[in-house]
Amino acid sequence: VIRSSLAATGEEEGFHENPNLLKPREAKKKKSKNELKREGNWEKGKGATVSNRASASSSASAKATIEIQSQLTKSFSLEEIFEIVRERSAEFDSINASTALHRIASKGTKDVVENDARVRASTSSTSVSRVGRRSTTSSAATTGFERRRSENEHPYERIIRNKDFENLMQSVEDNVNDMDQFGLANVAWSLARLRVLGNEDGVKDDGEKKMLDLIARNFAECVQRQGGASVRPQAFSNFMWAYGSFKYKIHDENVLKKIYDQLEISWAENADAWKPQEMANLLVGVAHANNATDKWSFYEKVQDCAIGNLKTNPLIVNDRNADQRFSFTARDISNFLWGLSKSLKSQKFNAQSIDSELISLMLQRLVAENFGGKQSALNVSMTVWALANCKCPVPPRFMEVLNQEIPRMAKRLSASQLDAIAWSIGEAKQTLQYDNDAIDAVAEAIAENRESVYNESDPELVAKIFWALSRRGRVPADKSIIDKLVKKVELCSDDLERSDKLLILHAWGVLRISPGEKVVNKLVRTFVEDGEDSDDDHGDELEPDECAKLLCAYGRIDYKPSSNTEYGMKFEKHLQKLAKTLADSAEASRLNPGTLALGLWGCALLKLKLDEDVLDLLARDALRQTDSLKPNSFAKCVFALATLAYDPTQDDLAKLVKKAQQTIFTTNYSSSSDANINNGDDGPSFVANESTKEEVRIALIKLGADSLA
């Protein structure tokens, strides 16, 4: 879940077409690059040569440098800063250049946000990204800012598109090799804050990439030379946050290694200097730019640093004069957990990678702060996504309060926030114990999404909530919620991707929802027509698991058009193709046991008349994998083989009976759920209830078993 890439400043993410501000400019008060080249006083990648820099240094004395710096720090308006740039940029050294850019970025953007209602509207609506099956990039509904982008407008037009800013950028380029780590971090932060580089997808031109690589390389050299314990945490934080804002991956592993090695030293030896916001923004930046490392000590040390802070700096409430900078707030916690979780998962670390003590301390703090009050919607959605992403166990008290909070805030959740919570409901059913009221509240909020009757975020969001409900086996108590969600499916069916249509059909089957023939036809026609258009017999390249889910979904919702109609005949052909795909996979021994069971059961529910060869291949594979089948899947297979009138050999039948006695007709196999054949959960714990035992007993007798004692 991605909070705004400009989370450090509370601004909404967004990147813009390159205004080419980092390219060589025309001549200004001081000599241009071309003039310096002609004079032999320019080195590529380094700017002016030593002799030329020495000349400039003599003209801009140390006294002038100090004077300029004083003027910049005492300037309180954008106009004052630009006046200094206009009059004295030729005298700027590395400190002056980075300071001027930083002052313009911090002061100028604040002025624009305060004075431009359009920008304020776009920056006040922070959101989380869409998550789950397809992507982790932001796909929230189009904002006012994005609409302005399509018209080639820029929120900071008057700041960055003028001659004075170009002159300043030239000065930054000329001095970048002389900047220390803090100056470089300020330059990176300022360019990100002003949204100068690239577009919202992170696409940069070659000149921009070279500049970012140069800044990163110089920053790495500076922090290594300075030593991590002596580098201000803010420099590390601003630098990594900026690259996350750029969505720019640093490809030179040696550069990242130098930075991360010094970060580890800083967290270990200078932990008390780190503010929570600095830790959180750094992790957000690392994750957002995909700059995560596979070095475990990096994550271990940042967690240790955070734990130390949480123990040392309690939350201060009801004291406006207290210094809160070193106390974790709800916002810091949600950012920290999101960045940490996303980076850990990208490097395939397991659920135990996030320290249980850290989780406990942070979630206690979240509850104590009421999830951040007005910002609870954003904080909750980010936090539960992070917890679900790494399957983190959570304290019961946290879930108790969370289950109370979600119904209260559900009506003000944005589409992307609902998306994040819905995904966590489906993804983490073992670790996040949502109660029925919380689940129903999220489903209702999606059903009644007030952003519009139908908008571009709805198709995937509606599919996701049906998936989440099916994972929990939950049908909302208020039946109108399902009716409204089904109506949304009907409205946006043409915009649903094929995978989402399959997901919805499968969920309807699991939940035993009867949505009506009209909307089912809209979804099913996609698969029937795709299969009809294909030249092979494999259902338009549907994967075996997709075939199994479709067969099972059709059977569960009892969808089988009359074979006397043209469409009915096409549908029958479609079913046979699905079964043939499963059989081909079974023949090649590539069929997953769970997929096999689901497909066979779907065929049985549909009472499908399979070709003898197809049935034999599926049955033989079920017998071959009998020992691998989980009890619930085994029960499905036995039921299906009996329903489809398979004739097993005596040896095969004995094998089925033995497996049934060990798993179905025993109380010693496991102890957990009271599952039966209709349960879609194929988990490891299974205790057959009396209904399942009777169904399996009858099925085995149909297959020819004499005694089941």
Where are these regions (language model features)?
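Eukaryotic RNA-binding helical-repeat scaffolds
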Residues: 3-709
